[in-house]
């Protein structure tokens, strides 16, 4: 029996930030970021329930290097809530770059029960689908999932070393059985960043699997 088919009504596919700006040709392009799209589309038939997250930044978002004179994308700074990586302007609200990747299948979108927009507060970033970067402000997703009886979360999307990593860690901390679908993710940073993400999710007990384990 495939993993996702066990208690299928309590299993959820969580797709992180598969958007135009985070795909090749976008403002925060991830190399081979669009390679996750076919894998995620394949998974649609294995899940009854899907949630998509969407980076949704105001134009003056504090995570943008353009808001900090003298700083460049990928510089590190300290903000009131802790360290922050600065990014190119990306996924600005209502811009074409904030749209979902056009290759996501109609079947996947038809099964989507919630689109969770994150990073919309100007003064704080939100890598995780569950908590803002201050680790205190909740997105409400954990309560939404608990109220509907979900227990098992399978995560795919972009970027593995940031938003997937922090979403997986926070899902596990919130008490959900959590899997990351490795071949349906890509990283934005170097190999060292990907390795750090893998260590972080494994240390908290998140499982790493592939699409073959689910199809």
Model features per residue range: what roles?
Residues 7-13:
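Extreme N-terminal starter segment of soluble prokaryotic enzymes
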Residues 10, 48-49, 112, 152, ...:
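Residues at the starts of beta-strands that form the adenosine-phosphate
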Residues 16, 54, 182:
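Active-site flanking residues adjacent to catalytic metal/cofactor-binding acidic residues
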Residues 26-33, 129-133:
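Short glycine-enriched, charge-decorated loop/helix-capping segments at active-site entrances
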Residues 38-148:
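Active-site alpha/beta core segments
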Residues 39-43, 164-175:
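Histidine-anchored nucleotide/phosphate-binding helix
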Residues 180-194:
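Short, flexible loop segments at boundaries between secondary-structure elements
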Residues 205-215:
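Short acidic-hydrophobic, aromatic-tinged amphipathic segments that line or gate anion-handling sites
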